[in-house]
C-alpha cells in the first residue's frame, strides 16, 4: 500500500510541476502577444526609454496630453 501511495504522490507532484511550467510558459508568450496587439503604445515607450526618468515622465505626459486633448474639445 505504501508503494502505491508513494507512486501516486510522485505522479501527482510531477503533474503539478508540469502544469505549473506550462502556465508560466503560456503567460510569458501571452504577454509578448500584447506587444503585437498595441504596437504604437509600446513603440512610444521604447522611444523614451533611454531618457532620464524625470524627462521621460515629462515627455510621456506631454505625449499623452497631445493625444488626449483633441478628443476633449470635439
From Swiss-Prot:
Superkingdom per UniProt: Bacteria
Identification of the protein by name: Putative protein YozX
The species this protein was found in: Bacillus subtilis (strain 168)
Organism phylogeny: Bacteria, Bacillati, Bacillota, Bacilli, Bacillales
Amino acid at each position: 500500500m505504501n508503494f502505491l501511495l508513494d507512486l501516486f504522490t510522485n505522479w501527482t507532484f510531477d503533474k503539478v510541476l508540469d502544469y505549473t511550467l506550462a502556465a508560466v510558459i503560456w503567460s510569458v508568450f501571452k504577454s509578448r502577444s500584447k506587444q503585437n496587439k498595441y504596437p504604437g503604445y509600446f513603440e512610444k515607450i521604447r522611444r523614451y526609454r533611454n531618457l532620464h526618468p524625470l524627462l521621460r515622465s515629462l515627455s510621456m505626459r506631454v505625449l499623452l496630453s497631445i493625444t488626449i486633448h483633441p478628443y476633449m474639445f470635439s
